Amino acid sequence: MKKLAIIGATSVMMMTGTAQANFTSSGTNGKVDLTITEECRVTVESKSESFLRSGLVANRHITNLGIQSTGCGTGQRVALKLGAGSYDDTNGAHMTHENGTDKLLVSMGSATGDGTQDGGVYYINRDGNWNGQMVFIVRNDQQHLPTGKYTLNLEGGFWTK
């Protein structure tokens, strides 16, 4: 019993006798981002382009975006999903103006024509990896739109049937 009391007193003394350090911030902050993906990983290139308003005519080529995939197998078709502010049932695919209201209507497809659009998702018509170019063009004449920045958001992934 005496031994138990001594051990208990020693434990308490060690806990209460521990000094605490103070942290003072004096530098820059850093962070680590980790993205976990499916085995079928699709990477979408980003680009910035500049046009004159008079160039917003039907079928005007806007840009090509490179798509690369790895690890895609049977039953997985490389796909792009039009993200927030880039697709709705009324306008279809579009680029949204920085004012949040105006929309530049666009069409998209693979440079080789081997894909299908299903709502806000465009997928390649075969299983497995696909590395290629997506083409974006102006739909209809749209010179009436205000100048400024328009954005199209895309998410790489895969489509399963």
Curated annotation (Swiss-Prot):
Its main location: other. One of its GO terms (cellular component) is pilus. It comes from the Bacteria. InterPro entries: Adhesin_Dr, Adhesin_Dr_signal_peptide, Adhesion_dom_sf, Dr_adhesin_sf. Keywords: Fimbrium, Signal. It is found in: Fimbrium. Residues 1-21 form the signal peptide. Pfam families: Adhesin_Dr (PF04619), Dr_adhesin (PF12393). Hemagglutinins of uropathogenic E.coli mediate adherence to the upper urinary tract. These adhesins bind to the Dr blood group antigen and also agglutinate human erythrocytes in the presence of D-mannose (mannose-resistant hemagglutination (MRHA)). Belongs to the Dr-adhesin family. This is Afimbrial adhesin AFA-I. It comes from Escherichia coli.
